[in-house]
Amino acid sequence: MRRCPCRGSLSEAEAGALPAEARMGLEALRGGRRRQPGLQRPGPGAGGPTGRPEGGGPRAWIEGFSLHSEAERTDFGPAPCPDGPQAEPCGDEHEECEAAGLGVASEKPSQNKELDGSNLQTHPKLSSPLAEMEMAGSWTDGFRTDLHRPDLQARPKRASLCTQPGFDESWTELDRSELWQTLPERDKPWVDHLRTHQDMSRLQNHPACPSPEPSAGTSCKELSADGSRTPHDTDGFWIESQTDGSLIGPSTQTACRQPANDGFSAQDTDGTLIQPGTDDGPWVDSVLEKSNGDDPLMEPEPRDLVTNLCSHLECSSLCPVPRLIITSESPEPGAQPLGPQARIEGGTGGFSSASSFDESEDDLVAGGGGTSDPEDRSGSKPWKKLKTVLKYSPFVVSFHKHYYPWVQLSGHAGNFQAGEDGRILKRFCQCEQRSLELLMGDPLRPFVPTYYGMVQRDGQAFNQMEDLLADFEGPSIMDCKMGSRTYLEEELVKARERPKPRKDMYEKMVAVDPGAPTPEEHAQGAVTKPRYMQWRETLSSTSTLGFRIEGIKKADGTCNTNFKKTQALEQVTKVLEDFVNGDVGILRKYVARLEDLRDTLENSPFFKTHEVVGSSLLFVHDHTGLAKVWMIDFGKTVALPDHQMLSHRLPWAEGNREDGYLWGLDNLICLLQGLAQS
């Protein structure tokens, strides 16, 4: 039985708990790129000759977009049926489950867009007042709406930012006349045709509330001037109003705010694995500590982002997740305290997000680490000295006589163990097993881990899958959590029926924002997990873009998981640019791979009939130019009731089970395309 990564100690490593090779830096030389055992694996999941060919044309969904009613859209299917039976999610003991395996990269050239656009038009709901929006800037010109109504006319040749209304509302078409630049010496084409969720049914005009700097505590921003306003996110350009009384986007702590109490949920990756280099020094667990005031961890600065957005979005009376928790059940134990500070050295790394529900341990602040300033967004040095935690590697992978240690970046210990022949064992989760088995026969197979079934080890069950990183040399890795929510509807129902206090969740919440808990929650010192997750999602780009960055490990060993309040478009764009170090070739490969994935998702029977919640996209590239993306984390992917299908783009309202996966993917592709063009 291997020791879990979060309960070891430095003294054990020094006393010889590790093999000599692990303690001395695994000095074995690498002999080129690693391959899976035997000949090149056939099949689409192995990256071999039968995989997807590289190359291909860009998507044409932006231009010439025809307008259809919702029923006519081939990728949407019939309307959701909220009353049908739902698949049972994995239990709490398996919430940390995720997937990792090999896929195949395919490449398409990026698509260039000319920017145009001049005026603003809004199509509100019949009973709602006219909502207006004003925007300035060349890189936001040409917003576009993703239309579902046959009575609206498309405006040809307009790159667009798509706003997603509620279910009965009209779609908004946004034009601008002035230039808007946020970074000097560069156009910003990547916001063309980005999408936002918007509930237009209760839109109200509101006086402007200028805000000179983006922050999670405001809901009004100055946006240059055509005299119109629309509900908007505080730090970005996307907002989604919820019918359960919650809103994503701005905080609820300013005078000009949206009337949400619970907001959307959030979630960290658990069990994320990372391989430090094999140069020298002990293996380091890269759980990112909160930096103290003397050495703050800097988030990218949203340079000169000026917007002016005000609105009141009224919410329905659906019962929110309870905030006052009264129960006799004892709270679950929190994460282990963080250890001494260290920095990862070396190249080869592994990174795999785990639990779709449990948050990563880097949320907790323990020991003498202190907390970083959540409002510090100077961005002048986005990859400053990072503080990590020294722990020994949970296991060492041996593949083709190449040894590389796996270190858990965040999350619960014991999720992963080393398999044989470059395979990884992940703690068993029935939902994930069922999903992976179905995906092996679905068109999505090249984009998901290759699955080898369940195995038993030391009396414990594991799902066996391929190591996603076996073909990379010193990779850079990024985990993006996809979708507009990361919790199942069943979890909300359970939280209402049997609210369970979580002291560790309360500590995580106050570490980020001491004023976030209610007085009752402060008195009890605990919050429910869905309550924490809903609050957490209001801070991140999950609420504004339909995806959020969970963590990044770069080839030089630098790790960063401090993206809890990375919400604004500019912040997310800067992080993506730093991840690839401005390499246009890598960006184009990522764009081609994601466009191919989007095409496959829209034609996948599995995807149309499953609610995909808490799933991630794993981005991996190395110095050789190899770049791939995979879908991972299927521990909370559940089948829909019979005859129900999802669009994966509509806003979520309790009962419709929409997850917003394609909405987030559309926006992610747009951002990467813009970076490649610039």
UniProtKB/Swiss-Prot annotation:
Q: Where does substrate bind?
A: 481, 502-508, 529-536, 636
| Positions carrying Phosphoserine | S160, S398
- An example of a Gene Ontology BP annotation on this entry? cellular response to calcium ion
What does UniProt list under activity regulation? Activated by calcium/calmodulin. Inhibited by high concentrations of the substrate Ins(1,2,4)P3, and allosterically activated by the product Ins(1,3,4,5)P4.
Which tissues carry this protein?
Highly expressed in tongue epithelium, taste papilla, heart, brain and testis. Weakly expressed in lung, liver and kidney.
Keywords in alphabetical order, please.
Answer: ATP-binding, Calmodulin-binding, Cytoplasm, Kinase, Nucleotide-binding, Nucleus, Phosphoprotein, Transferase
Q: Where does ATP bind?
A: K426, E466, D467, L468, D479, K553, D633
The GO cellular component terms are: cytoplasm; nucleus
Which SUPFAM superfamilies does the record associate with it?
A: SAICAR synthase-like (SSF56104)
Q: Which intervals of the chain form a coiled coil?
A: none
Asked if Kinase is a keyword of the record, the answer is: yes
Taxonomy, superkingdom = Eukaryota
Start-end of Gly residues biased regions? 44-58
Q: Name one GO molecular function term.
A: ATP binding
Give the EC number.
2.7.1.127
Question: Does the record's keyword annotation contain Metal-binding?
Answer: no
What broad class describes the main subcellular location of this protein? nucleus
* Motif Nuclear export signal per UniProt: ranges: 318-326
Question: What family does this belong to?
Answer: Belongs to the inositol phosphokinase (IPK) family.
Q: Which PANTHER family match?
A: INOSITOL POLYPHOSPHATE KINASE (PTHR12400), INOSITOL-TRISPHOSPHATE 3-KINASE C (PTHR12400:SF106)
Can you say what this protein is called? Inositol-trisphosphate 3-kinase C
Name of the gene encoding the protein in the UniProt record = Itpkc
